[in-house]
């Protein structure tokens, strides 16, 4: 779809969506986002130009269907997939990609750390119609045999350009965690829980030098500008437990991310900001407000947040609660959490469970925000339920397969798709049926009092 769009711009000196938006040009990608969101093309252009909406769309990902992340758009969700050094299979990552798209992921991050990382990534991009993001430090470390002491700025930039050429649409880079922040980490209950953040800490402590992503930020911007890779500024110091939420370390990094946002915008590079983490419910709104203030309203992209630390095996639920509140208060994209969080590498089944939990959270937030049309599907479901239209109910459900499966466990015969009851109440105790009888009597003139 995008090949002709990209081809006609090939002689432009800058080809980022932010550059075009600032020049007053509405690109085909902006038109596509406006159509999907039900918003005007000019609104999309102006939001991109202000930096409040990003369209992650690497010029080399030609099969990508453009989507927008920002407060003006519906709340988006990201699904994390990826191999590890203990479990690596390209076919499994392709399956996770397809499952993610089937159940509604708006973007996918390939967080692979084991196996043939380039082959996995290229396969994921090839099979994906949604933007693919990465955390480049994982491959950077992989390519230097897992020893952070072998990392050089040249090796960093080589990996990032390679991934950009392959079609990665956004990079998470841990560039706001500085050498001077290290003493603040010592005060924490759980230290650093970000993989990328812990690697940067190891590098800085070994060499007593500044964060290389911060040092090479201008060179990174040049790569992003060339391929229109959106920067997702990572939160190395996100809280990994409730006790560390909103602490001095987290906020010190957030201030630096705000400064780097302005530097990226100067180069026409799109930016979103990553956020926590583990946050008590009563602190979520404050975190969102601080991010908007310190990071100039760049889209906020949060992991959860988890609102309790004791839900192991059910962290997709614990985090979806926080995610719904965060999105209601202005977060633009939610990074899903699966039931395996803190316990192991998720499989395709876990991916499905995580996505559905977050689809619910995102949709509930859009309703609470009063987004036009957000409740239409809910109202249609109410009509289908009251009319006992079972097949329509299955179609409208966020997970049609699960809805039909649960209904058919007790009443599998096709005749029950026309029944005026389900297995919960049976024909005699159905409240809908009784209510309809009451309304019918009232309509025929019978007194209800």
Curated annotation (Swiss-Prot):
A single GO cellular-component term on record: cytosol
Q: Which GO terms describe its molecular function?
A: 4 iron, 4 sulfur cluster binding; carbon-carbon lyase activity; zinc ion binding
Q: Which residues bind [4Fe-4S] cluster?
A: 422, 425, 430
Pathway where this protein functions = Cofactor biosynthesis; thiamine diphosphate biosynthesis
Sites binding substrate sit at 80, 109, 138, 174, 194-196, 235-238, 274, 301
The protein's matches in Pfam families, at most eight in alphabetical order, are given as: ThiC_Rad_SAM
Question: Which residues are involved in binding Zn(2+)?
Answer: 278, 342
Q: Determine if 4Fe-4S is one of this entry's keywords.
A: yes
Task: Show the catalytic activity.
Answer: 5-amino-1-(5-phospho-beta-D-ribosyl)imidazole + S-adenosyl-L-methionine = 4-amino-2-methyl-5-(phosphooxymethyl)pyrimidine + CO + 5'-deoxyadenosine + formate + L-methionine + 3 H(+)
Required co-factors = [4Fe-4S] cluster
- What function does the entry list? Catalyzes the synthesis of the hydroxymethylpyrimidine phosphate (HMP-P) moiety of thiamine from aminoimidazole ribotide (AIR) in a radical S-adenosyl-L-methionine (SAM)-dependent reaction.
The UniProt similarity line reads:
Belongs to the ThiC family.
Quaternary structure annotation from Swiss-Prot or TrEMBL: Homodimer.
**Protein's recorded name:** Phosphomethylpyrimidine synthase
Gene this chain is encoded by:
thiC
